[in-house]
Amino acid sequence: METSNYNFTDSQKESCAVSLMRDTVEALSLRDNISYEEALLRFTSSKIYSALFDYDTGIWRESPDYLLNLY
């Protein structure tokens, strides 16, 4: 992964993480044929959810497919 010298604020990182989470939860619900709400509950109970909001991991920069593969 290419890194830049730009320093993102925590607010920007959070915005990216929330957007990524929404897209990933939607993909999870389609993949597993479950409701969005059920997918959200499952996802937020996972270790990946915690890692997503640990900005030091850099996962907030990735794609929904990448995150779903980690899940």
Spans of features found by a protein language model:
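C-terminal alpha-helical interaction appendages
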Residues: 1-71
